[in-house]
Every structure is written in C-alpha cells, then in structure tokens.
C-alpha cells in the first residue's frame, strides 16, 4: 500500500477530505522522524513502538573490488508491534 492509497482509504473511512488527510499523514510521519532523530521512542497504543537500535562498527567486504571496508557505528529505526497488533495479523 502506498501513501496515496493509505490517504484515499483513510479519507473514505473517516469522511475527511483527501487534502486534509494527506496533511495529517505527512504530519504524523514527519513527527515520527523528528522524534527518532532526537533519539526519542514513540509508543502508539494498539499499534506498537518505534525505537532506535544501535549497530556497532564492523568490517565488511566489497566483493566487486575484493577489498575490506569499515562500516561506522550507527543507529537504525526499529518497529516492534504490540501484542494486540500481532494477534490481529496472525488471526487474519
């Protein structure tokens, strides 16, 4: 499902026009990104938790050039769905 499809379906379900729904969806996504950039966790009851997971520095191989490269330590976004969400998906 694309963002446009999500906006269209949510607009139909709620009766809110698509432009307003698009602004709401983009606002939520932007707020989620900003919170994670500031290293804050985001918890949405009934859906799940967005957190950051730290990845340590590691050595990898560039197989096309047959050389080793260093990958710096970095954080990645991680989503953990809540129990109710997992059960609903498993039951479908």
Residue ranges and their predicted role:
Residues 1-92:
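Strongly charged
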